Curated annotation (Swiss-Prot):
Entry-linked SMART domains: Transket_pyr (SM00861)
Catalytic activity: D-glyceraldehyde 3-phosphate + pyruvate + H(+) = 1-deoxy-D-xylulose 5-phosphate + CO2
The protein's name in its UniProt record: 1-deoxy-D-xylulose-5-phosphate synthase
Pathway: Metabolic intermediate biosynthesis; 1-deoxy-D-xylulose 5-phosphate biosynthesis; 1-deoxy-D-xylulose 5-phosphate from D-glyceraldehyde 3-phosphate and pyruvate: step 1/1
SUPFAM superfamilies: Thiamin diphosphate-binding fold (THDP-binding), TK C-terminal domain-like
Subunit structure: Homodimer.
HAMAP family: DXP_synth
UniProtKB keywords: Isoprene biosynthesis, Magnesium, Metal-binding, Thiamine biosynthesis, Thiamine pyrophosphate, Transferase
Gene Ontology terms, MF aspect: 1-deoxy-D-xylulose-5-phosphate synthase activity; magnesium ion binding; thiamine pyrophosphate binding
Binding site for thiamine diphosphate: H75, A116, H117, S118, G148, A149, N177, Y284, E366
EC number: 2.2.1.7
Binding site for Mg(2+): D147, N177
InterPro entries hit by this protein: Dxylulose-5-P_synthase, THDP-binding, Transketo_C/PFOR_II, Transketolase-like_Pyr-bd, Transketolase_BS, Transketolase_C, Transketolase_CS
Length: 627
């Protein structure tokens, strides 16, 4: 792969020096480099292949970093990173100590706003535009948002606010690739499809180049766009009603269309909305054919594509959940499955196939997902909301006000609890224990392995109120999984190893590491299973029979399960040394999951080391003293 032009690019200033022919050639080199780079490190691929021309056009036309570009979600920002001096850093993409897979303000002045969760770009860019106006600074503010992210209410809240905000320059670029991760759903998607099928898009695609080679004066261009938008593609009035001047759709892979259009929009004042149509995976046929498979691949050979490896004997927790959901749906016709645009990631593909009338992908709309579930529960349905831990944060008010306050029967299956590895701090599910256990009526369960995940899912499903089961990303330990739908006693843990001196109270999958550490310490290990209701009887029993308590959790220490144990001891007036092990009070960057846990002292060796360091000067480690 030749990179003759790419080798000359060290900043967007270099892009602005290229002629039209060179710019098109650079697009091909940049796309090839993204493909080669991601195939070596893993990462988001399809979305980045689809934004190469758009990224080049934006940096060609706008004076970055003076002008602000905010990338919604941000997983499509690899071309942006490469063009802004981070090409060499792509070798360490999403690795510990390497560059992030998302825009990050601390990483580059070109990253105007940190993103990773969807639908925030318009709000952030609007805030920047108002700040620039107030400071008397003349600059452009661009929010690049995908069609999937546009389905979230926050995007429309921002546009509604922008429509009544005077004297600002704000350009919203809708990157319409008919995909988020899964294909987008809902009325907005149908609306955009009508736009793309309109005569204006057909005309722009067929004769756009000829028109733009003879670009008229700005005012005449604006007048013609207005005629097209209102007379030929009437649905565009939705965006115009918010106060935006709508332009498009145009071909997002045609630099001859993108560059002059952006140049003319830059010359206009006020609120502008550019609708570009791109193809996810563009330029790599395998990704074009299956953009979901190539959304976030691991390492692969681009010459042959992603190969199906030998199936692992260890199921992922996501797979365990998906199978349980189908099994429970067979037994209970009231079960309804809900996901906010994460069908594949949350394991609902088979459920959708088998129970299409009971499957609801509500789009990137976590607030709606939770209250939609509440409404179903009001009428006797049994909703299960399959959602990543980090995304439930977006529906927290609804969880409290609409579900828990009314004590409604909604089960939350929280995937990606704890550290998530390469996606880093933005996607880590570190806070669910703290933010859920304080909510009245809420059950919080944390299984130690795959089989226990199935047991706790059934237990929480049968509980007649709000309940959550948190489980991590990736495969379990290979535990044998019972095929039934058995339950366990609510709020009761179980002793997995009887020792002496020290009792380790483990919450979740770190139970396995705790058991390994306990072998060296001759410690007792309790698999607590529930954070709420917590097993008070077991805590007091272990405190009475041991010299010290150690709590272990893959969650934030502050407000976490260890805090719940201490609250029980304090309430009962029990004085015993307690060591809390968990995630520290800081955001934890991307890296390999196992390596990150080891670095935080949450592998078996680290747990043993922390216990010895805390109690080495006492005689609490009665077993360890003989080792």
């Amino acid at each position: 792969m030749t990179t003759e032009l790419l080798d000359r690019i060290h900043s967007p200033d270099d892009v602005r020096q290229l002629d039209r022919r060179e710019l098109k050639a650079l697009a091909e080199e940049l796309r090839g480099f993204v493909l080669e780079s991601v195939s070596r490190t893993g990462g988001h691929l399809s979305s980045n292949l689809g934004t190469v021309e758009l990224t080049l056009a934006l940096h060609r036309v706008f004076d970055t970093p003076h002008d602000r570009i905010v990338w919604d979600v941000g997983h499509q920002s690899y071309p942006h990173k490469i063009l802004t001096g981070r090409r060499a850093g792509m070798a360490s993409l999403r690795q510990e100590g390497g560059i992030s897979g998302f825009p990050k303000r601390s990483e580059s002045e070109y990253d105007a706003f940190g993103t990773a969760h969807s639908s925030t770009s318009i709000s952030a860019a609007l805030g920047m535009a108002v700040a620039s106006r107030n400071a008397g600074i003349q600059r452009q503010h661009i929010a690049v948002i995908g069609d999937g992210a546009m389905s979230a209410g926050m995007a429309f809240e921002a546009m509604n606010n922008a429509g009544v905000t005077p004297d600002i320059n704000l350009l919203v670029v809708l990157n319409d690739n008919d995909m988020s991760i899964s294909p987008p759903v809902g009325a907005l998607n149908r609306y955009l499809a009508r736009l793309m099928s309109g005569r204006f898009y057909a005309a722009a695609k067929n004769v756009g180049r000829a028109m733009l080679q003879h670009v008229p004066p700005v005012l005449e261009l604006a007048r013609r766009f207005e005629e097209h938008a209102k007379g030929m593609v009437t649905p565009a009035t939705l965006f115009e009603e918010f106060g935006f001047n709508y332009v498009g759709p145009i071909d997002g892979h045609d630099l001859d269309a993108l560059v002059p259009t952006l140049q003319n929009l830059k010359a206009l004042q006020g609120l502008q909305f550019l609708h570009v149509v791109t193809r996810k995976g563009h330029g790599y046929k395998l990704a074009e054919a299956d953009p979901v498979l190539y959304h976030g691949p691991g390492k692969f050979d681009p010459a042959v594509g992603i190969q199906q490896g030998k199936a692992s004997t260890r199921k992922t927790f996501t797979q365990v959940f998906g199978q349980w959901l189908c099994d429970m749906a067979e037994r209970d016709e009231r079960l309804v499955g809900i996901t906010p645009a994460m069908r594949e990631g949350s394991g609902l593909v088979e459920f959708e196939r088998r129970f299409p009338r009971r499957y609801f992908d509500v789009g990137i709309a976590e607030q709606h997902a939770v209250t939609f579930a509440a409404g179903l529960a009001c009428e006797g349905q049994k909703p299960v909301v399959a959602i990543y831990s980090t995304f439930l944060q977006r529906g927290y008010d609804q969880l409290i006000h609409d579900v828990a306050l009314q004590n409604l029967d909604v089960t939350f299956a929280l995937d990606r609890a704890g550290l998530v590895g390469a996606d880093g701090a933005t996607h880590a599910g570190n806070y669910d224990i703290a933010y859920l256990r304080c909510v009245p009526n809420m059950v919080v369960a944390a299984p130690s392995d795959e089989n226990e995940a199935r047991l706790l899912l059934s237990t929480c499903y049968e509980y007649p109120g709000p309940a959550s089961v948190r489980y991590p990303r990736g495969a379990g330990r290979g535990a044998e999984i019972s095929p039934g739908l058995d339950t366990v006693p609510m709020g009761k843990g179980i002793v997995r190893r009887q020792g002496r001196g020290i009792a380790i109270l483990a919450f979740g999958t770190l139970t396995q590491a705790a058991l390994a550490a306990a072998e060296a310490l001759d410690a007792t290990v309790a698999d607590m299973r529930f954070v709420k209701p917590i097993d008070r009887e077991l805590i007091l029993q272990l405190a009475a029979g041991h010299d010290a308590i150690v709590t272990v959790e893959e969650a934030a220490i502050m407000g976490g399960a260890g805090s719940a144990v201490i609250e029980v001891l304090h309430h009962e007036g029990v004085v015993v040394p307690v060591l809390q092990l968990g995630l520290p009070d800081r955001f934890i960057d991307h890296g390999d999951q196992a390596a990150l846990l080891a670095g935080l002292g949450l592998d078996a060796a680290g747990i043993e080391r922390s216990i010895r360091a805390r109690f080495e000067k006492s005689n609490l480690q009665s077993g360890a003293q003989t080792k």
